A protein has these predicted regions:
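Active-site rim elements
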Residues: 20-26, 104-108
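Acidic/histidine-rich alpha-helical segments that form the ligand environment
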Residues: 95-133, 148-154
Length: 177
């Protein structure tokens, strides 16, 4: 027995159903969530982007800033062992705060830059390749594979895009993918 058409879930538009390579699938789904994050910001005013949402305590723009730090921490410092600042120096909550002198454009540009760098690193390595030593990971026994790191990013985005979906509904009633 099948569900009536109005009860069938929408078909995801990406990745296409004929993509079966695990590396490509993972990267395409991760990009889908990155794009969903940005879609959920569409139509919000600057005050809505900056204001903490209800009981959540963070702003939509703060979430974007946090995910930029997550990309940097896991891909550049974690996987590539680049000598980069992995956490803001102020305190644990600093990566969620957007000061008044930091523009929406600045936050989005920094986020896009980290995503671009992550994509380049992920495209140039095999899923089984271990993280390089010297950044986040000091010993081979600690170093996860690129695949494991990408799955971590995937779950981070899935969780936070879901949070943003709730935040958006609280802000203006908008729901959906």
């Amino acid at each position: 027995m099948s569900a009536p058409p109005e009860r069938r879930p929408a078909t995801l538009d990406d990745p296409p159903v004929d993509v079966s390579d695990p590396h490509e699938l993972l990267l395409r789904y991760l990009d889908w969530y990155r794009e969903a994050l940005l879609r959920k910001l569409d139509g919000l005013t600057e005050p809505e982007l900056r204001a903490p949402v209800g009981p959540l305590g963070w702003s939509p723009l703060g979430l974007v800033k946090h995910l930029g730090w997550v990309e940097r921490r896991w891909m550049r410092w974690g996987f590539a062992a680049e000598d980069v600042l992995a956490y803001p120096s102020e305190d644990d909550e600093a990566e969620w705060r957007v000061p008044a002198d930091e523009s929406v454009g600045d936050v989005l540009a920094a986020y896009h830059d980290e995503v671009r760098r992550s994509r380049a690193l992920a495209a140039s390595a095999d899923l089984a390749e271990p993280a390089r030593l010297g950044g986040r990971f000091r010993a081979a026994a600690q170093a996860p594979s690129l695949g494991r790191i990408l799955f971590h990013l995937f779950q981070e985005y899935a969780r936070h895009v879901g949070h943003l979906d709730i935040a958006r509904e609280l802000l203006d009633g908008t729901v959906g993918e």
